[in-house]
Amino acid sequence: MAGRRRATWLGNARKPKSMKTLLKLAAAGMRGERLVMLTAYDAMFANYASKAGVDVLLVGDSLGMVIQGHTDTLPVTVTDVAYHTACVARGNVDSVILGDMPFGSYQASVEDAMRAAATLMQAGAHAVKLEGGATMASTIEFLVKRGVPVVGHIGMTPQSVHAFGGFRVQARTDTAVAQLKLDLAAVTDAGAAMVVLECVPAAVGAMLASESKIPVIGIGAGPRVQGQVMVLHDILGWTAKPPKFARNFAAGTNNVQDAISAYVSAVRDQSFPNESECYA
């Protein structure tokens, strides 16, 4: 009886014959298709997002802020992400599930990174994301060679918030832009399938995306990248002080799934983000 009730409200008792994969999405992104990534933390919202056409469900360490109530992502543990990954996996239809590697789970050694990645994949992740450019290249390579698909994350990396002196726009100087180019090349050469680029001027995002050999998924990086990622709570208008690059897609809609569908459509047709939602 419980199983039948679950199938009724989730509506995904039967998985589709063809699931999306990270490598297929990466190839599509490089062909010019716009990729859509969105955070998800539980079965119901994962189900809404997957049905709406979201390509990648990111079980982000942002859960520390929007779910647990912390002021940053640093307190989040592998156990936390694994729990929410398992929840998301139960609601997913055909999206790729991307598990975020939390602070302290991969920086000390590649062995730590492998253990953390294995835990997240055993919970239901199809790939993992970790922050850092050239300094993390050897870790990315280690994981990829052992069968773990990896997404990189450069630019504003929230786990380094204290090193940055707060959540700040990056790549404001020629030196910083040059370093971002090196970081992008390093994670690409290490085998990352795609890379998240966060909080940089739109012109920098466009330049990096045009030169990249892998899809660049922007968050606060302008419209001229291969895809976008957003925090679920931001696109639903639930954040008290949303970032500049956020848009409330729930305004004028009747339900959550309509809001997520509007986000998906806006990314696909490149109407999101607009100029006012970008950094100059």
Regions found by a protein language model. Name each.
Residues W9, P16-A250, N254-A280:
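Alpha/beta enzyme core
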